UniProtKB/Swiss-Prot annotation:
One of its GO terms (biological process) is biotin biosynthetic process. Catalyzes the conversion of dethiobiotin (DTB) to biotin by the insertion of a sulfur atom into dethiobiotin via a radical-based mechanism. This is Biotin synthase. GO terms for molecular function: 2 iron, 2 sulfur cluster binding; 4 iron, 4 sulfur cluster binding; biotin synthase activity; iron ion binding. The gene is bioB. It comes from Francisella tularensis subsp. novicida (strain U112). It holds the Pfam family BATS.
Length: 313
């Protein structure tokens, strides 16, 4: 697949593009939505300078910071997520690298969440090959490590971690036989070519991602992008085109509509489902920011006649 071929797919008439994406989707998935819950288990004071992130220690934001939560409180959240209908429990920690003093505790938490009957996913920053192997032994199903944007636009967003470091972490995850969860953020001021190059980078990863989060920028006051923009720099049609193109390129991946969904109309979300989305974060909170409400999600899924994949198991 070349950059030009991706452009040609994206540029098709919208109805034709959505129809092809829907046909590919229906060949590979049932009529279900994967519900995932996301919990910030360590919040704030991150040494990274990601210009979109309120958890960066470089910026003055109003988030409530806390160290790694205790195991019991995390397990209580996981049980609540399962009872609410989630199939996967994702845990995020604002680290560049997981501290050695916290590694064993995180591994134990993964094991106990897995024992609840939930799929497990974590995002802990960069990890080496040995750490990836130990996380696999603990029962980890998915490791999230987003590319965020194209290799070319990346230095405009992050300077504290090289793009190639992200690729290396994904290689370590794949070599440990952990499913790769990797996507990006749209609406940060990137060009269309940057979005196409992001897709090309995802195609060239050491292992094909089984899960692709598609985020739109949530401008948070105090961050460079939050002070620059009042909303994500992408319209609904561009978003739907990007999702449909991603579905065509990744026929067997779960595509998750992630950050920014709270600001989308139900009609826009419906178009996203038609274009290939079959996973959402479920719950009123998304790390430190608000998410679409559970009531709103239940209403929309009922209107569309969609069930969670947990209900179908």
């Amino acid at each position: 697949m070349t950059l030009q071929q991706i452009k040609e797919i994206y540029s098709r008439p919208l109805t034709e593009l959505i129809l092809q994406a829907l046909e590919i989707h229906n060949k590979n998935f049932g009529n279900d939505i994967e519900l995932c819950s996301l919990k910030s288990i360590k919040t704030g004071t991150c040494p990274e300078d990601c210009k979109y992130c309120p958890q960066s220690g470089h910026y003055n934001t109003s988030i409530e910071k806390h160290k790694l939560l205790d195991k019991d409180s995390i397990l209580a959240e996981a049980k609540n997520a399962k009872d609410a209908g989630s199939k996967r429990f994702c845990m995020g920690a604002a680290w560049k690298h997981i501290p050695k003093k916290d590694f064993d505790q995180v591994a134990e938490i993964i094991t106990e969440v897995k024992n609840l009957g939930l799929e497990t996913c974590v995002t802990l920053g960069s990890i080496n090959a040995d750490e990836a192997t130990k996380l696999k032994q603990a029962g980890l199903d998915y490791y999230n490590h987003n590319l965020d944007t194209s290799r070319e636009f990346y230095p405009e967003i992050i300077t504290t971690r090289k793009f190639e470091e992200r690729i290396e972490t994904i290689r370590n995850v794949a070599n440990a036989d952990i499913n790769v969860c990797c996507g990006g953020i749209l609406g940060m001021g990137e060009s269309l070519d940057d979005r196409f190059n992001l897709l090309l980078e995802l195609l060239q990863l050491p292992a094909a991602p089984k899960s692709i989060p598609i985020n739109t920028l949530i401008p948070v006051k105090g961050t460079p992008l939050g002070d620059k923009y009042t909303n994500a720099q992408i319209d609904s049609f561009e978003l739907v085109r990007f999702i449909a193109t991603t579905r065509i390129l990744f026929p067997q991946a779960r595509l998750r509509l992630s950050a920014g969904r709270e600001n989308m109309s139900l009609e826009t979300q419906t178009l996203c489902f038609l274009a290939g989305i079959n996973s959402i974060f479920y719950g009123n909170k998304l790390l430190t920011e608000n998410n679409a409400t559970v009531n709103s999600d239940n209403f929309l899924l009922a209107k569309l006649g969609l069930k969670s994949n947990a209900e179908l198991c």
